[in-house]
Design a protein with these regions (language model features):
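Gram-negative outer-membrane beta-barrel domains
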Residues: 1-254
Length: 254
């Protein structure tokens, strides 16, 4: 006796339901500009603003709630580590002088460097779901861990070279050729936008741009006397993959 064949469910083609928790990872690049100064003896030109560039990768966790009109509200936290750094010749700094003998100390010539170890954000998201694609904007709090260095490269004869030379600090004490701060954590703000596409089986791929701004931070340098300040603005471009812990589409049709 013949039996009736059972039809297999059709492939999911309905609009995505983004409601639920999700977790994933991302990779990308970060670039920006910093502003490094000695407290009390600022650099007189713009050479103290090195560009920084590097790769980063990290993880993210969030929650979305989709409403009947296709608007999506959510919150997301992420953290990414990398090697985002840069440096340049900064010019001279009055009051921080080059080592020499029987000479009038000229202002020391410096290179300045900035290095970011990791960045994290906690942000609210507002998006709109169009079929299987989510378009969204975000804004919230940004955190970074970074360090700052100023290298003295000016010789006693007043001729510059790429060899680091000892300097006299603001207290007139001869110290090493490098003024560096320990790594420090500071808080700023972030805004961004992106798009996410449902790949099926609760997986999705995303592309995102974020702008992070961190206000000026002051830290005691390694000589124990001199203070360095630093502020930075960073742009991130990230590609990522997420897994949603909830049904990804309206459902199969039989």
């Amino acid at each position: 006796m013949p039996t009736k064949a059972v039809r297999a469910p059709r492939a999911l083609t309905g609009p995505t339901n983004w409601t639920g928790f999700y977790a994933g990872g991302f990779a990308g690049a970060a670039a920006g500009r910093t502003d490094i100064q000695f407290v009390g003896t600022p650099f007189p030109d713009a050479g103290n603003k090195p560009w920084v560039l590097g790769g980063l990768g990290g993880i993210e966790l969030g929650y979305n709630r989709q409403f009947g009109n296709n608007w999506v509200l959510g919150v997301e936290g992420d953290i990414g580590a990398g090697n985002v750094h840069g440096g340049r010749t900064a010019g001279t700094a009055d009051g921080v002088n080059a080592k020499g003998e029987n000479v009038t100390f000229a202002p020391a010539l410096f290179t300045v460097e900035d290095k970011t170890n990791w960045m994290a954000t906690v942000a609210g998201r507002v998006g709109y779901s169009w079929g299987r694609t989510l378009f969204y904007g975000k804004g919230g709090v940004a955190i970074e861990d970074s360090s700052t260095t100023a290298n003295c490269i000016y010789g006693a004869t007043g001729q510059s070279s790429d060899v680091h030379r000892p300097c006299r600090n603001q207290a007139g004490i001869e110290k090493e050729d490098r003024f560096s701060t320990p790594s420090y954590t500071r808080v700023g703000w972030t805004i961004g936008f992106g798009t996410e596409f449902d790949l099926g089986k609760n997986w999705s791929a995303k592309a995102e741009y974020d702008f992070l701004s961190f206000g000026r931070h002051t830290a005691l340098a390694s000589d124990g006397t001199t203070f360095l300040t630093d502020r930075s603005d960073i742009s991130q471009v990230k590609l990522g993959v997420n897994y949603r812990f909830a049904p990804g589409a309206v459902g199969p049709k039989f």
